[in-house]
A protein has these predicted regions:
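Conserved, structured core segments of small domains
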Residues: 1-91
Length: 91
């Protein structure tokens, strides 16, 4: 399964930004390992969307749990899982 992880910020930007450097390092590690294949902030900057590689729900939850934003309580995630039956080459 693939998973869309939609985060919503729970704190004002100045509080979220205190944890942002650690979050970005975590994100680089997840992308580098292929666990996250696409990520970015929402246009209105109220949160972000991350798309995982092919993995089970427990692995996707582990990604969320390792995010410094989760540990700091500045964001929460909603997970939408899908089978990814149609995909571009390389995914």
């Amino acid at each position: 399964m693939f998973h869309v992880l939609k985060s919503t910020y729970l704190q004002p930007p100045e509080v979220v930004n205190q944890t942002r450097p650690a979050h970005l390092e975590w994100l680089k590690d997840e992308v580098g390992a292929g666990r996250i294949v696409l990520a970015g902030r929402l246009e209105d900057e109220s949160g972000a969307v991350l798309i995982t590689g092919d993995m089970d729900a427990e692995q996707a939850q582990d990604i969320v749990d390792r995010d410094p934003y989760t540990a700091a309580g500045v964001a929460r995630y909603e997970r939408l899982s899908f089978n990814g039956a149609f995909r571009a080459a390389g995914l």
